[in-house]
Curated annotation (Swiss-Prot):
The keyword Oxidoreductase applies. The gene is pdxH. Pfam families: PNP_phzG_C (PF10590), PNPOx_N (PF01243). FMN binds at residues 66-71, 81-82, 87-88, 110, 145-146, 190, 200. GO terms for biological process: pyridoxine biosynthetic process. Substrate binds at R13, R14, E15, Y16, K71, Y128, R132, S136, R196, L197, H198. Its EC number is 1.4.3.5. Belongs to the pyridoxamine 5'-phosphate oxidase family. It catalyses: pyridoxamine 5'-phosphate + O2 + H2O = pyridoxal 5'-phosphate + H2O2 + NH4(+); pyridoxine 5'-phosphate + O2 = pyridoxal 5'-phosphate + H2O2. It comes from the Bacteria. Its cofactor is FMN. The lineage of its organism: Bacteria, Pseudomonadati, Pseudomonadota, Gammaproteobacteria, Enterobacterales. Keywords: Flavoprotein, FMN, Oxidoreductase, Pyridoxine biosynthesis. This is Pyridoxine/pyridoxamine 5'-phosphate oxidase.
């Protein structure tokens, strides 16, 4: 470990000066504000603006997190894809509750979605899978996600084997690969503010409308 006299994480701090978030800035529907912020993150050329931290819980109440890419969103929910044998997919099969966090650090912003998941239909999954680059399709066949392997070479050898196998024609959709739709009922927007007086607003679904409240930082 580094000597604390040389490096102390408590000394790492900065002021948040990119502006605030006011009630007048909000939209009636949280997805409209999310889309605005996402487009601004893309315009600012943030790396991986669609990257989100996906949190799930196992049967013992132990939370797990990982970064996953958002692939679609609309009023029905937010969509991502994964190996159905993965840890997150197995946990969601037991407990569909989920949290998504978009960490747009360079804009001093974050957005948190809370909700439950539902599996996508085979037709929806096939439509997206068919749009992926061929090497990515083959990669989906290679990895038994979250399983233990002896070395990276195991994956690379399997990839080359399958690349040869699928050299001609289309790569079929693996039966163990699918997607989830997050049906959200709570969305929180956070904007960094001066003197640690950050702006937070939470949307909570109320039948066909959204209740909006400001939260203390």
């Amino acid at each position: 470990m580094t000597d604390n006299n040389e490096f102390d994480v408590a000394d790492l701090r900065r002021e948040y000066i990119r502006g605030g978030l006011r009630r007048s800035d909000l939209t009636e529907n949280p997805l409209e504000l999310f889309e605005r912020w996402l487009k601004q993150a893309c315009d600012a050329r943030l790396p991986d603006p669609t990257a989100m931290c996906v949190a799930t819980v196992d049967a013992n109440g132990q939370p797990y997190q990982r970064i996953v890419l958002l692939k679609h969103y609309d009023d029905q929910g937010l969509v991502f894809y994964t190996n159905l044998g993965s840890r997150k997919a197995q946990q969601l099969a037991q407990n569909p509750h989920i949290s998504l966090l978009f960490p747009w650090h360079m804009l001093d912003r974050q957005v948190i979605f809370l909700g439950t998941t539902e599996r996508l239909s085979t037709l929806e999954v096939l439509k997206y899978f068919s749009s992926r680059p061929k090497d990515s399709q083959i990669g989906a066949w290679v990895s038994q996600q979250s399983s233990r392997i002896s070395a990276r070479g195991v994956l690379e050898s399997k990839f080359l084997e399958l690349k040869q196998k699928f050299q001609q024609g289309e790569v079929p959709l693996p039966s163990f690969w699918g997607g989830f739709r997050v049906k959200f009922d709570s969305v929180e927007f956070w904007q960094g503010g001066e003197h640690r007086l950050h702006d937070r607003f939470i949307y909570q679904r109320n039948a066909d409308t959204w209740k909006i409240d400001r939260l203390a930082p």
